[in-house]
């Protein structure tokens, strides 16, 4: 006889059982948290109290791919690496970075639903925006078991647009995402990169010029990979086009601008670029004690990078967005330095979110924002019994 669902710490229902399970949990007012493949459930604030986990691991697969319309519909538990592999067969891709800690080739990238629920954009946001801007439709199961839909299967459909944006970055606190329709992009046939090294006081103006220029890099990232922790942060630039001549012109333009500023510019072939981008995204999800989400106004990025608290730490920060990650072992980053970094980010018009921290540290994942009353009001509308991911929003 099967053990009742509500007695299980982790529930992995079949797709046909999912809605009924959520209804049962609602009737019991039982706390629970949605999950994809569970690879990053320990990110962010811990869920308050005992809480079951409802996994979408079996809710997996591509429902429909329309290459001519550049759209794909997939179930929320679909591994991101499998979705990208299928799109690549049609020379398309979902223009998002692998989540931090995915490892080489994205094998530990987690699920599509988890990617959207976290809503954390990487360097590719510079050209393609974040994942929330690529969602054109979704289906979710609300806390009472009701199915809800927003958007559609065509890019021009804007019905339910606000709901889609709400779900991106909701950390599983508003509902369980069951399927998603996203906009795909043609895979660029040509891609090369540039690695720029030099003093921050020279790199800062160059980054500002590049952001305001007519060039359109895929990424312009401040970065310091784990292998170069003794060095200052540099710039990692990715360029993509339909032909090699255009890339040569763009690389030449940037290199010519860099030379008088005593900035060295190293051209990167596709494999070299992919390797360096991979280094800036962490090797695996459990490879460090601290994982910090940094955010500042873009014009404050160089001041943040010069902060002694960040000295020697691997990091990546979008030059155009001011958003990024830093990570470290507990011995390399004392708690008081994280608190100092948080104050710096706030003074620079941003914030610091602690996604993961050592067991010996008890810092709040994030601080209260002025918008908290509005966020809590939205939460009550979606989850009146406060069952979903308690403490995560």
What are these regions (language model features)?
Residues 10-34, 56-106, 120-153, 188-200:
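N-terminal glycine-rich flavin-associated loop
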Residues 33-34, 219-226, 315-319, 354:
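Short beta-strand
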Residues 34-40:
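Glycine-rich beta-strand-to-loop/alpha-helix junction loops that act as flexible
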Residues 46-49, 57, 102-107, 261-393:
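Conserved glycine-rich FAD pyrophosphate-binding loop
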Residues 81-83, 201-206, 243-253, 300-307, ...:
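Short, conserved charged micro-motifs
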